[in-house]
Structure formats: C-alpha cells, structure tokens
C-alpha cells in the first residue's frame, strides 16, 4: 500500500514548477501503478500550450476556473470545480487560467518518471527510469 501526504511532497523533487504552473507528482512510474497521479496548479490569468503526444491524460478540476481550447477544432470549454476533461487523442490544446488559480487532479498514462519537463511543443518526452 502506498500512502502519501501532499505536505511531504512540497519543496521536494516531486514538486515541479514552471512559468504559471506547479505540478505535484504524487504517484510516479516507479510506484508501479501503471499511471502517474498529480495535483497541478494553473495560475490565474496564465496561458499554456500543451501537447501530450506521448501520453494520455485525464484531468479533474477541484477548484478555480479557466478554459481549455482544442487546437484541432477551435472549441473552447469552460473548466470549473467538478469538470473533467480527457485528452484521449493526444489533443494539442491551450489551457488558460481564469479569474482564480485552477487546482487540477491529473492522471497520466504511460506514467511519468518525475524527470520530464515540457519541450518546445508543449509535450513530455518518454523518459525511462
């Protein structure tokens, strides 16, 4: 059994910060669950281009608000507490923070190792342990 307290992750290498976002990686590939599990904070008023071409991601909003734009279709969807979106087609998208920080709970498949960073097109490379 794995039990982790978010407070124990803060300030460690499992808390990764970029411009306008913070990802707290609660489960990683080495945990052997077949997916990774993160809490991600998107700062209010920020905009991020992401394209997880090597990963599938499901995201559930538990606080805050913003939008996600599907760059293939131009559709913009509102995100708020209680909304889930799943990037089931490796969807290239723009995530925009709204009037308050968004707190998102995310699952990635394949799981990330914790060493990934976004590259120039907004994706994560596949990293082996």
Curated annotation (Swiss-Prot):
Name the enzyme's class.
lyase
Q: Name one Pfam family in it.
A: Ectoine_synth
Name the InterPro entries for this protein.
Ectoine_synth, RmlC-like_jellyroll, RmlC_Cupin_sf
Taxonomically, which superkingdom?
A: Bacteria
Task: Indicate the secretion signal residues.
Answer: none
UniProt keyword Lyase present: yes
Q: Which UniProt keywords apply?
A: Lyase
Q: Name one GO biological process term.
A: ectoine biosynthetic process
Q: Which GO terms describe its molecular function?
A: ectoine synthase activity
Q: Where are the transmembrane segments?
A: none
What EC number(s) are associated with this protein in UniProt?
Answer: 4.2.1.108
Catalytic activity as recorded in UniProt = (2S)-4-acetamido-2-aminobutanoate = L-ectoine + H2O
Which pathway does the protein contribute to? Amine and polyamine biosynthesis; ectoine biosynthesis; L-ectoine from L-aspartate 4-semialdehyde: step 3/3
Q: Which Gene3D superfamilies match?
A: Jelly Rolls
Give the HAMAP family listed for this entry.
Ectoine_synth
General function of this protein: Catalyzes the circularization of gamma-N-acetyl-alpha,gamma-diaminobutyric acid (ADABA) to ectoine (1,4,5,6-tetrahydro-2-methyl-4-pyrimidine carboxylic acid), which is an excellent osmoprotectant.
Q: What does the sequence similarity comment in the record state about its family?
A: Belongs to the ectoine synthase family.
NCBIfam families to which the protein is assigned, alphabetical: PRK13290.1 (NF009806)
* Protein's UniProt name: L-ectoine synthase
Taxonomically, what lineage is the organism? Bacteria, Pseudomonadati, Thermodesulfobacteriota, Desulfobacteria, Desulfobacterales
């Amino acid at each position: 059994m794995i039990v982790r307290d978010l407070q124990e992750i803060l300030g460690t290498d499992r808390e990764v910060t970029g411009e306008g976002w913070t990802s707290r990686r609660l489960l990683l590939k080495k945990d052997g669950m077949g997916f990774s599990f993160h809490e991600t904070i998107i700062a209010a008023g920020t905009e991020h281009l992401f394209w997880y071409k090597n990963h599938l991601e499901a995201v559930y909003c538990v606080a805050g608000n913003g939008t996600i734009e599907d760059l293939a279709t131009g559709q913009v969807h509102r995100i708020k507490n209680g909304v889930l979106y799943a990037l089931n087609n490796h969807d290239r998208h723009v995530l925009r923070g709204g009037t308050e920080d968004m707190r998102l709970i995310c699952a990635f498949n394949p799981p990330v190792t914790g060493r990934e960073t976004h590259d120039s097109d907004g994706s994560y490379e596949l990293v082996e342990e």
